[in-house]
């Protein structure tokens, strides 16, 4: 009896010492091993492409174009399963109202409203409405266009959230929204000149604000180094390395010209 108890005690002691030695090492059995094949896709999968949603959005975009052919000019689906609808400026209210109230749409949330300035276009400003449908868990992007002088209809009557968004666009880009209840600047100071997000707005601005010790207040003065337009033709740092320079183009010889002698 005593010998059997001694053997059990000795086995327990050996097991405890083995657990103590292996306490600092991770258990292989508890760690799942993930094996990847050679052809595994290593692209980010934050928002993977969904073929089912892609087909549904494409079908819905075609449906919107059939319902509102007067205003819808182009429909496409982005890589992140977001539908983009390009419309005529006159169709802002009809299209947004349709997308908000239609049973198969229900885009009742205006997530964002912004603008893009492309000076090379005839209608340089692109107005972008980002809508969200909580009912169907889908997004849609409505785009339209305008220029510096042509006003665009305000969307406040459809989405109340467009109020401050349109004020910000007016302040930063100078796009005028007709029938807006309170279209005034929202970010810049009183008496600010110009619209900072336009591509032709000078980087240094027109006015410099500083504190004057003589008059004991903040004064506004014209900027001495003001530039009228942004200059994108800058010197490249790679020009310091002759190896990376492109070889000079050879002169094209006209009929009757002689080839210049090599030096």
From Swiss-Prot:
GO terms for cellular component: mitochondrial inner membrane; mitochondrial membrane; respiratory chain complex I. Residues 1-35 form a transit peptide. Its main location: mitochondrion. GO terms for molecular function: NADH dehydrogenase (ubiquinone) activity; NADH dehydrogenase activity. It is found in: Mitochondrion inner membrane. It is a peripheral membrane protein. Keywords: Electron transport, Membrane, Mitochondrion, Mitochondrion inner membrane, NAD, Oxidoreductase, Respiratory chain, Transit peptide, Translocase, Transport, Ubiquinone. It catalyses: a ubiquinone + NADH + 5 H(+)(in) = a ubiquinol + NAD(+) + 4 H(+)(out). Belongs to the complex I 30 kDa subunit family. Core subunit of respiratory chain NADH dehydrogenase (Complex I) which is composed of 45 different subunits. Interacts with NDUFAF3. Interacts with RAB5IF. Found in subcomplexes containing subunits NDUFS2, MT-ND1 and NDUFA13. This is NADH dehydrogenase [ubiquinone] iron-sulfur protein 3, mitochondrial. It comes from Gorilla gorilla gorilla. The gene is NDUFS3.
